[in-house]
């Protein structure tokens, strides 16, 4: 290789990342216009386009590098020099942390995810921990109640860049003050002030004002979801001021925010104070930097592994027919491997399963589908694997495993947030907790369906319960669009004997679903059946599902709320907004 080529390659990779993040910011900056125009289908398409940008630009850089090197092979010393040059470019680079992830992605694409060593990759960052570059302007603005909270909130709202008229600004301000007074008390509120992010956070059909409520006893989140009426007027739907509420808004089961962040590390650090339960990976994920979130997630896994004496075990719950799932007992994530062979009733391919997981990545997850990170050639030390799990891996996924002696390499897996399987949760709870879980499950089904997602397999074992008590779907191998399903009523039996026959008396085609049958597997438990009939009986009617399909086909995009209906100002304070 010619001398100096290492620097050219390093510069080419960094320039490629510049191009990628520039397009990322360009797509993100269109969020305000899409919101103001109420172009919800464009919102959905922009989200998909932004997700695809990263891999597209990695591919462009890989082709450039193949041209630069004329396809010649490179030795280890050459690759180390490339990384050294790249590292020297980062100290003054504003997005150094994501640039390292981009370097990793280019390397993995070039070398087909082989030889993934710390010497060749940024397994951990080359820069000091939580180091930030000079911020050209503050991320947020402070507002003090020098003339009272009504004046303060009027200034906050007047500072917003949105160009639509407000339905009733004074009403919304009084709702916020009423909520804050109930939360803090009049005296504490008078001594508090706000710090509000300069950029709005856009997602689905809402623009979120994100801020900090700074009180004498600590800092609280201050979140205002701004929506539009059917007439295109703005209103504030609620005010959220607890870390639990903020955690759900920024949750792993929701689509990524569109927020203009030229310095993502600084924004992540600013958010950390109001989202103390979120990891660095989760914060990057929330603002749409999902590939760097994957890097941070892997680092969190390595740090945990280094500090524990645990072994991987099969994850609790009913064993899946498509995926082999394992975990570390104290770690909050699960590892999912597609089995070599599926149960006979699962007539699908591994490629189909991967396509389903990609669909979830790109779709609006409406707070009801867990996000995943996809890994190739994932290395595990044998000493960290329990004998029972090792036996299971070799039995169910041998084709995806390479034995390296002291290690194994799993060709492909997903990492996902660990939850309590809903079937286990339902066995353990009674009373109000049981009622809440069934209400949550039905709401999850409804919200997925409204977002054009049919889970396919609706058994409780395919859903999990988060630490906030939310029910989330996590088994995607039978997922499909609502519009692809044919929801049918079961025809009446022709003769009395029909109901006793082992085969149905009616024809069943691929894609046919009979909602009446849901009752058999969802209501078998006598504790659960009456709750279902009370709260979700319409889920057992085909006409309910067909009506949803019609709304989807007509282009209607449902509102998605990251909080309970009872928290909406219109419900809490009695005035309906429409």
Swiss-Prot record:
Keyword Transferase set for record: yes
GO terms for cellular component: cytoplasm
Location of the protein in the cell: Cytoplasm
Catalytic site: 371
For biological process, the GO terms are:
glucose metabolic process; glyoxylate cycle; tricarboxylic acid cycle
Which residues hold ATP?
Answer: 315-321, 336
> Which reaction equation describes what this protein catalyses?
L-seryl-[isocitrate dehydrogenase] + ATP = O-phospho-L-seryl-[isocitrate dehydrogenase] + ADP + H(+)
GO MF annotations in UniProt: [isocitrate dehydrogenase (NADP+)] kinase activity; AMP binding; ATP binding; phosphoprotein phosphatase activity; protein serine/threonine kinase activity
Major localization class = cytoplasm
UniProt-listed InterPro entries: AceK_kinase, AceK_regulatory, Isocitrate_DH_AceK
Q: Pfam families, alphabetically?
A: AceK_kinase, AceK_regulatory
Signal peptide feature range: none
> Which UniProt keywords are given for this protein, alphabetically ordered?
ATP-binding, Cytoplasm, Glyoxylate bypass, Hydrolase, Kinase, Nucleotide-binding, Protein phosphatase, Serine/threonine-protein kinase, Transferase, Tricarboxylic acid cycle
Domain of life of the native organism: Bacteria
Q: Which EC number applies?
A: 2.7.11.5, 3.1.3.-
- Say which family it is in: Belongs to the AceK family.
Tell me which NCBIfam families the record gives.
PRK02946.1 (NF002804)
Role description: Bifunctional enzyme which can phosphorylate or dephosphorylate isocitrate dehydrogenase (IDH) on a specific serine residue. This is a regulatory mechanism which enables bacteria to bypass the Krebs cycle via the glyoxylate shunt in response to the source of carbon. When bacteria are grown on glucose, IDH is fully active and unphosphorylated, but when grown on acetate or ethanol, the activity of IDH declines drastically concomitant with its phosphorylation.
- Name this polypeptide is given: Isocitrate dehydrogenase kinase/phosphatase
What species was this sequence derived from?
A: Escherichia coli (strain ATCC 8739 / DSM 1576 / NBRC 3972 / NCIMB 8545 / WDCM 00012 / Crooks)
Q: What is the lineage of its organism?
A: Bacteria, Pseudomonadati, Pseudomonadota, Gammaproteobacteria, Enterobacterales
Q: Which gene encodes it?
A: aceK
């Amino acid at each position: 290789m010619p001398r100096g080529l290492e620097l050219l390659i390093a510069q080419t990779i960094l320039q490629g990342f510049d191009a990628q993040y520039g397009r990322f910011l360009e797509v993100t900056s269109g969020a305000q216009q899409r919101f103001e125009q109420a172009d919800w289908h464009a919102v959905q398409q922009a989200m998909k386009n932004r997700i695809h940008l990263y891999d597209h630009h990695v591919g462009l850089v890989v082709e450039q590098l193949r041209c630069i090197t004329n396809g010649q092979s490179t030795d280890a010393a050459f690759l180390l020099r490339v990384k050294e040059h790249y590292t020297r470019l980062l100290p003054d680079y504003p997005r150094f942390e994501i640039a390292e992830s981009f370097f990793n992605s280019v390397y993995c694409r070039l070398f087909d995810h082989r030889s993934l060593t710390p010497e060749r990759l940024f397994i951990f960052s080359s820069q000091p921990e939580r180091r930030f570059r000079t911020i050209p302007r503050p991320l947020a603005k402070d507002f003090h109640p020098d003339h009272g909270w009504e004046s303060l909130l009027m200034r906050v709202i007047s500072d917003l860049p949105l160009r639509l008229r407000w339905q009733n600004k004074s009403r919304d301000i009084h709702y916020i003050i009423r909520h804050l007074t109930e939360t803090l008390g009049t005296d504490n509120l008078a001594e508090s002030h706000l710090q509000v992010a300069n950029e709005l956070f856009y997602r689905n059909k809402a623009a979120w004002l994100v801020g900090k409520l700074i009180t004498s006893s600590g800092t609280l989140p201050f979140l205002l979801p701004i929506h539009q009426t059917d007439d295109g007027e703005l209103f504030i739907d609620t005010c959220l001021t607890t870390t639990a509420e903020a955690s759900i808004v920024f949750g792993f089961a929701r689509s990524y925010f569109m927020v203009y962040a030229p310095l993502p590390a600084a924004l992540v650090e600013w958010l950390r104070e109001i989202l103390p339960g979120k990891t660095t990976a989760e914060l990057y994920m929330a603002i749409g930097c999902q590939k760097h979130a994957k890097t941070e997630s892997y680092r969190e896994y390595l740090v945990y592994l280094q500090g524990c004496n645990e072994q991987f075990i099969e994850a609790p719950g009913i064993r899946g027919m498509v995926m082999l799932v394992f975990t570390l007992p104290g770690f909050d994530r699960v590892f999912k491997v597609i089995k070599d062979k599926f149960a006979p009733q699962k007539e699908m391919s591994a490629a189909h399963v991967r396509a389903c997981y990609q669909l979830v990545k790109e779709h609006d997850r409406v707070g009801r589908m867990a996000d995943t990170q996809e890994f190739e050639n994932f290395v595990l030390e044998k000493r960290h694997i329990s004998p029972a799990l090792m036996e299971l891996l070799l039995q169910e996924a041998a084709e995806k495993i390479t034995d390296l002696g002291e290690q194994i390499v799993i060709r492909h897996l997903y990492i996902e947030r660990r939850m309590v399987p809903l079937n286990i949760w339902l066995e353990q709870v009674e009373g109000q907790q049981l009622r809440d879980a069934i209400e949550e499950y039905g709401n999850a089904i409804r919200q997925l369906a409204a977002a054009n997602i049919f889970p396919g397999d609706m058994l409780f074992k395919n859903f999990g319960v988060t630490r906030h008590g939310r029910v989330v779907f996590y088994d995607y191998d039978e997922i499909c669009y609502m519009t692809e399903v044919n929801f049918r009523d079961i025809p009446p039996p022709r003769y009395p004997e029909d109901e006793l026959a082992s085969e149905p008396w009616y024809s069943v085609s691929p894609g046919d679903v009979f909602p009446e049958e849901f009752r058999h597997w969802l209501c078998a438990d006598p504790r659960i059946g009456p709750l279902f009939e009370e709260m979700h009986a319409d889920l057992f009617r085909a006409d309910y599902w067909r009506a949803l399909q019609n709304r989807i086909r007509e282009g209607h995009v449902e509102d998605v709320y990251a909080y309970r209906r009872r928290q909406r100002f219109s419900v809490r304070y009695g005035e309906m907004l429409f």
